[in-house]
Amino acid sequence: MTIGIGLLGLGTVGAGVAQILASPEGRHPLVGALSLRRVAVRDLQRPRPVTLAPEIIGDDPAAVVADPTVDIVVEVIGGLEPARSLILAAIAAGKPVVTANKAVIARHGAEIAAAAAERGVYVLMEAAVGGGIPIIEPLKQSLGANRIERVSGIINGTTNYILSRSEEHTSELQSPDHLVCRLLLEKK
């Protein structure tokens, strides 16, 4: 059985996903059962770091979500809209969603989770939090009977970067706010 994947976004993360799907050799056996059926991009003329069949690439993300050959929607376009609307449309169509979009999960995560629960589909977001560490599903499934009172640690790559750099560059003349702003700009 082949599972059709619809990919929303073909930037750095999307191109990486497409590359994995295009060359599953040496990867988990289930990757071979996945087929990239449709890809939506903002700019059809922009050069891409991965070569895909031209007939699967388009600039209409809603068409990717609605395509009956797409079984799972992977959203890596970032930002709040149209990401939120596309995720909700996929859920309404009964399609599981995988997202690496921190912004949409932070702002609309409760709404998305409620829609997914109501429709009975998965929304996987490990790629958006904790540096891709598979922590969300184990917390939801395996530890449901436990009462977790606190999770502590550096669970975000940006936070880790800021803490590491601030330790190296802190001086009495710099305010913490100034340092954080400078480091965030430096990281971009």
Segment roles from a protein language model:
Residues 1-93:
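N-terminal glycine-/serine-/threonine-rich beta1-alpha1-beta2 phosphate-ribose binding loop
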Residues 8, 75-77, 100, 107, ...:
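Structural motif
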Residues 18-19, 49-52, 109-112, 134-141, ...:
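Short acidic, glycine/serine/threonine-rich loops at helix termini
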Residues 44, 78-80, 103, 128, ...:
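Short glycine-rich anion-binding loops that position phosphate/pyrophosphate groups of nucleotides
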Residues 83-89, 102-131, 136-139:
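Rossmann-fold NAD(P)-binding glycine/threonine-rich loop
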Residues 96-98:
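A short hydrophobic/small-residue beta-strand
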Residues 119-120, 124-167, 171:
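Rossmann-like NAD(P)H-binding beta-loop-alpha module
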Residues 172-188:
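Positively charged, low-complexity/disordered segments
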